[in-house]
């Protein structure tokens, strides 16, 4: 990215109005495909001349604007090499260029907002593990929680419309609509899910960019009303980007309640509402009665229906007590556990017993989904019994051990924040025995004979527990400090979580 920094220094006052010319710049596609400026930007494809990369993009966009090419039959597309064999390839080229172009102003705004807030170590805030210390601090004092799955729009036109209030470039929106109608035939009111899924797989960066704009629009509206509806100002987080024409956009939503906007917000007064989101899932938690949680629930439903025209079933949003139910978020089952403690006190000649209740957040590893994932990857069966990995048997011993080691380290790195480590030890045992069976299969031997010949200490150095590493580092430290490092450990270098 550093070699392209000179191209990203746009004029701050004009950055919204000049996105369209960026689509015709070579370095945009070099950024999209992570290639050098002088290298080819297209993947290898039979029958394609990769010497005319940007020229073909320009010709393709020009033809899209010609009226006689807006409607092309299937027979013509088979004859024309521009729209025939390489149609999916050209679709991916333009979508990647569009995705990078619309992300540039947001990146500059994000950098500017972090500089104004004097946030130097902003990379620590990006770690998804930074959410769990917030859970540990706030959730033991809350009563109700609701996990909300943000619904996906039924039409990509809704995603494009959300961009109008973030970028003031009419030419870019016109090209976006023309691109979708030209390549994907988005000419029906309701787009089949299969077509959206196929388009998302072929153009992941473009679909993800549109979805992020939709989620950002939803979150900005929600946080705006969260701040306005609370007696206390929100200090722990804020909206990074400026809202545009917000009051005009909510006019249709206000008519639903048939009341004044301020009187509507009066029912949502809740200074103890907490909101956390990652990708398409969000968590709402509150200290007050479930009545206010239901108000927020139906507010979100009406917001999706009236503002984004997305249908959401109220029955899919559940409101549960934290002390009785667990919620699934970022690969953990979390709940609030009550630890009773009895203290005996004596005053003069009288003694009495005091019972104290301590609330603590528990984070538990979902062992059954993890075993299913390992079984799907052929590391074990559905019951959790380790099996060999025959696909890796052709590799060298070092490569086999290194592959298993990398998976084991990643799981240990992510799930070291669990309150109960027994499930993590079971996952490590499955991977360890699967590695041994794979090595024994390669050498055409049994596990017992293989371990007897090479020794059971063969894999000890590859599967060293992180707790043992900490105990070696702090061998001379106090026992309290050693217990601290044997507990939950959250890392600030985990930026992504794959479901």
From Swiss-Prot:
Q: List where in the cell it is found.
A: Plastid, Chloroplast
Family that this chain belongs to: Belongs to the intron maturase 2 family. MatK subfamily.
Q: What is this protein called?
A: Maturase K
UniProt keywords (A-Z) are: Chloroplast, mRNA processing, Plastid, RNA-binding, tRNA processing
The principal localisation class reads plastid
Q: Which GO terms describe its molecular function?
A: RNA binding
What HAMAP family does UniProt report for this protein, alphabetically? MatK
Please list every transmembrane segment annotated in the UniProt record, as residue ranges.
none
Gene Ontology CC terms: chloroplast
GO biological process annotation, one example: tRNA processing
UniProt keyword Chloroplast, yes or no: yes
What Pfam family is a match for this entry?
Intron_maturas2
The answer to whether keyword Plastid applies is yes
| Record-linked PANTHER family | MATURASE K
The UniProt function text for this chain reads:
Usually encoded in the trnK tRNA gene intron. Probably assists in splicing its own and other chloroplast group II introns.
């Amino acid at each position: 990215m550093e070699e392209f920094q000179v191209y990203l220094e746009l004029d701050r006052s004009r950055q919204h109005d000049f996105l369209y010319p960026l689509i015709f710049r070579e370095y945009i596609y070099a950024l999209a495909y992570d290639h050098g400026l002088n290298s080819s930007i297209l993947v290898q494809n039979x029958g394609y001349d990769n010497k005319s990369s940007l020229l073909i993009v320009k010709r393709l966009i020009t033809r899209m604007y010609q009226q006689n090419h807006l409607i092309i039959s299937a027979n013509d597309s088979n004859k024309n090499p521009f729209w025939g064999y390489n149609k999916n390839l050209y679709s991916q080229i333009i979508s990647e260029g569009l995705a990078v172009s619309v992300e540039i102003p947001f990146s500059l705004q994000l950098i500017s907002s972090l500089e104004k807030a004097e946030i130097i170590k902003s990379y620590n805030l990006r770690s998804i593990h930074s959410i769990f210390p917030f859970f540990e601090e706030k959730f033991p004092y809350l009563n109700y929680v609701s996990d909300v799955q943000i619904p996906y729009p039924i039409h990509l036109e809704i995603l494009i419309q959300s961009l109008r209030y973030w970028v003031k470039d009419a030419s870019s929106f016109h090209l976006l609509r023309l691109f979708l109608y030209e390549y994907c035939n988005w000419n029906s009111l309701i787009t089949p899910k299969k077509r959206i899924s196929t388009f998302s797989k072929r153009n992941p960066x473009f679909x993800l960019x549109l979805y992020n704009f939709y989620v950002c629009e939803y979150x900005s509206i929600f946080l705006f009303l969260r701040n306005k509806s609370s007696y206390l100002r929100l200090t722990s987080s804020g909206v990074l980007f400026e809202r545009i024409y917000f009051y005009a956009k909510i006019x249709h939503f206000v008519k639903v309640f048939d009341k004044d906007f301020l009187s509507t917000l009066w029912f949502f007064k809740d200074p103890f509402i907490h909101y956390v989101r990652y990708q398409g899932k969000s968590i709402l938690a509150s200290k007050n009665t479930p009545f206010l949680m239901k108000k927020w629930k139906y507010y979100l439903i009406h917001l999706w229906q009236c503002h984004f025209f997305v249908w959401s079933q109220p029955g899919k949003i559940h409101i549960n007590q934290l002390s009785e139910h667990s919620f699934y978020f970022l690969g953990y089952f979390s709940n609030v556990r009550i630890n009773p403690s009895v203290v005996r006190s004596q005053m003069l000649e009288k003694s009495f017993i005091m019972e104290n209740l301590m609330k603590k957040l528990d984070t538990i590893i979902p062992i059954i989904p993890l075993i299913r994932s390992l079984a799907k990857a052929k590391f074990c069966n559905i019951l959790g019994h380790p099996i060999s990995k025959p696909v890796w048997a052709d590799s060298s011993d070092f490569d086999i051990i290194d592959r298993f080691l990398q998976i084991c380290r990643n799981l240990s790195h992510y799930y070291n924040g669990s309150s109960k480590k027994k499930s993590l030890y079971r996952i490590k045992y499955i991977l360890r025995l699967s590695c041994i069976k794979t090595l024994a299969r390669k050498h055409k031997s049994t596990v017992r004979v293989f371990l007897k010949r090479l020794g059971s200490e063969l894999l000890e150095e590859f599967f060293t527990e992180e707790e043992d590493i900490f105990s070696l580092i702090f061998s001379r430290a106090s026992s309290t400090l050693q217990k601290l490092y044997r507990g939950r450990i959250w890392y600030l270098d985990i930026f992504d979580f794959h479901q």
